[in-house]
A protein has these predicted regions:
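Short intrinsically disordered, low-complexity coil segments enriched in acidic
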Residues: 1-7, 183-186
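Eukaryotic terminal intrinsically disordered regions
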Residues: 3-101, 107, 339, 346-471
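Extended cytosolic scaffolds built from alpha-helical repeats
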Residues: 52-352
Length: 471
C-alpha cells in the first residue's frame, strides 16, 4: 500500500549513496505519495467507507479525477522543472518514454478522461497555462520522443491521444458538451501549432538526432509521421468542432420557436391564437418543454464565456456565434412564414421585442454584425406592422422589406390575420402582390434553406506561437 511505499523510499534514501538529483527525485515522489494518501483518507472519511488502494499505477487515475487542473499543472511543472535541472541519463528518459502502460495511464486517463476542466469565467478567467497545460505536456512528451529518435513510439502515442480526445468529447451530450468541446478544441489547436513548428523545422533539415543522442531512425519515417499527424490533428479539430456544435444546435433548435416566435413578454399585446399547432400540443401533452428568450441567451452566454476563457481564436468565436444566430434567424423565419394565425401585428410586436434582446446581446458582445442573421425575421415583423391599404403602402413594404422575395411577401400578406378593428386587405391589393411573383424564378424562394443540426464548414485558424517547448 501507500504507507509501505513511503517507508521503502525512505529506506532507499538512507541506504544508498546517490547523486543529489536522484535523492531529490525520491523525496518528491514521497511527497506525492503522502499527498495521495491524505487525499484518499479524507475522501474515505467523507464517504464513511474504506476504499482499498490498489497498485500504484491506479493512484494516478483517482488523483486526476479529484484534483483540479491548476493542481495537476503545478505538480507536473514541478516534476518537469526538477528533471530538467537534474542530470538524468538519456537511457532513463528513454525507458520512461517506452513505458506504454504508464504513459497511457498518465496521459490518456490523467490528462484527458479524468481531468477536471477549469470552469470558464469572464470575471476571473483561468490563465493560459491552466487551460493549455494538457496540450503542452502532450507536446513535451512528443518532443522528447522525437529528440531520442522514438519515431514509431511517438506515432502510437499520438494516435492514442487523438483517439481518446475524440471519444471523450463525443461522450457528452446537450448542454454538457459545450465546456469539454471548446476546452479540447483549443488544446488540440495548440498541439497542432506545435506540430506545425516541427514541420517547419523539418523542411529546413532540423529534426531528431542533431545532438547525437537519438537512436537510429529513418528520416523518411519522421517526415511521413509529421505529415500524417498534422493532417490527423486538423481532422480532429474539425471533428471536435462538429461534435459540440451539433449538440449545441440540437439544443438550440428545441428553444427557437417556443422562445422567439411563441413567447409573449410584452404586456398589452398578448394574443390567444393557437397558431395552428393545437393538434401538436394535444399530442405532446404537458411533456413538451417550455423555453423562453432567457434560455437562448443563457446558451449564447455560456458558449461565449467558454470561447473567451479557453483562449479560442476570435475568428472561431465569430464563426460559432454567427452559426448559432443564423440557426435562430432561419428557423424562426420559416416557422412564422407557415403560421397563418401568427401573421398579425400583435405577434409581430412580440417577436420584434425578442429580436431586440438578441440585437442588444450582439452589441454588448462586440458582434453587432451578428444581428444580420436575424434580418429576414426582422423584416417580416416590420411587414406585419406596416399599413396594407393602398398601392403606395405596398410600395413602401417592398422598399422596407428589400431582403424578402416576392413569394415571401405574398405569403405573409395573404396569411395576415386581420384584427377585429382592422379593415380586411382588399382583393386588389392581394392581386397586385401576387402579380409581382415571377413564375419559375429560381431566385424567388419561399423558405430559407433550413439550418440542420450538423455544424457548418469549419475554418481552421492560423497556427499559434507555442513557447516553452524545445523543438
Amino acid at each position: 500500500n501507500l504507507e509501505l511505499e513511503i517507508a521503502t523510499l525512505h529506506s532507499q534514501i538512507r541506504s544508498i549513496e546517490a547523486p543529489e538529483s536522484m535523492v531529490q527525485s525520491l523525496r518528491s515522489e514521497i511527497a506525492m505519495l503522502r499527498e495521495q494518501l491524505s487525499r484518499a483518507t479524507a475522501e474515505n472519511e467523507r464517504n464513511g467507507t474504506t476504499v482499498p488502494l490498489g497498485p500504484r499505477h491506479q493512484h494516478h487515475r483517482s488523483m486526476a479525477s479529484d484534483v483540479p487542473a491548476a493542481d495537476v499543472l503545478e505538480f507536473h511543472e514541478d516534476v518537469l522543472d526538477e528533471r530538467r535541472g537534474a542530470d538524468v541519463p538519456p537511457e532513463e528518459i528513454i525507458d520512461l518514454l517506452e513505458d506504454e502502460a504508464q504513459l497511457d495511464e498518465d496521459v490518456l486517463h490523467g490528462l484527458i478522461e479524468y481531468l477536471k476542466i477549469p470552469l470558464p469565467s469572464l470575471q476571473n478567467p483561468p490563465g493560459p497555462k491552466e487551460v493549455l497545460f494538457p496540450s503542452h505536456l502532450i507536446s513535451l512528451v512528443t518532443n522528447e520522443m522525437w529528440k531520442y529518435g522514438l519515431v514509431h513510439e511517438s506515432e502510437r502515442f499520438l494516435a492514442n491521444v487523438m483517439q481518446t480526445i475524440q471519444q471523450h468529447v463525443m461522450d457528452f451530450h446537450g448542454d454538457d458538451a459545450i465546456i469539454p468541446g471548446i476546452f479540447w478544441l483549443s488544446n488540440v489547436h495548440e498541439i497542432l501549432s506545435f506540430v506545425c513548428i516541427a514541420e517547419s523545422d523539418m523542411l529546413q533539415g532540423v529534426g531528431p538526432g542533431l545532438d547525437g543522442s537519438a537512436r537510429d531512425f529513418e528520416w523518411g519515417d519522421y517526415e511521413r509521421l509529421v505529415t500524417i499527424v498534422k493532417h490527423d490533428l486538423d481532422s480532429l479539430e474539425y471533428n471536435i468542432y462538429h461534435t459540440w456544435m451539433q449538440q449545441s444546435k440540437k439544443l438550440l433548435n428545441k428553444m427557437v420557436v417556443p422562445a422567439l416566435v411563441e413567447s409573449q413578454s410584452l404586456p398589452g399585446f398578448i394574443t390567444n391564437d393557437s397558431g395552428g399547432r393545437l393538434l401538436n400540443r394535444l399530442l405532446a401533452g404537458n411533456h413538451a418543454p417550455t423555453y423562453t428568450m432567457d434560455d437562448i441567451l443563457a446558451l449564447l452566454n455560456k458558449t461565449w464565456k467558454c470561447l473567451k476563457s479557453y483562449y479560442v481564436e476570435p475568428s472561431v468565436t465569430q464563426q460559432v456565434i454567427t452559426e448559432l444566430l443564423k440557426m435562430i434567424g432561419v428557423t424562426s423565419f420559416n416557422d412564422l412564414l407557415m403560421r397563418r394565425n401568427f401573421c398579425s401585428w400583435k405577434r409581430a410586436m412580440q417577436i420584434q421585442y425578442n429580436i431586440t434582446r438578441l440585437e442588444e446581446w450582439c452589441k454588448s458582445h462586440d458582434m453587432p454584425e451578428g444581428s444580420l442573421q436575424l434580418e429576414h425575421l426582422l423584416q417580416a415583423t416590420k411587414l406585419l406592422q406596416l399599413k396594407k391599404a393602398t398601392m403606395s403602402d405596398i410600395d413602401i413594404i417592398y422598399d422596407v422589406c428589400w431582403m424578402l422575395t416576392p413569394t415571401q411577401i405574398q405569403k405573409l400578406i395573404s396569411h395576415y390575420h386581420v384584427a377585429d378593428y382592422e379593415n380586411p386587405i382588399s382583393p386588389e391589393i392581394l392581386k397586385a402582390v401576387a402579380s409581382r411573383v415571377v413564375p419559375n424564378d429560381r431566385n424567388d424562394h419561399l423558405l430559407l434553406p433550413p439550418e440542420v443540426d450538423e455544424a457548418g464548414p469549419y475554418e481552421l485558424p492560423a497556427p499559434r506561437e507555442v513557447t516553452g517547448i524545445e523543438t
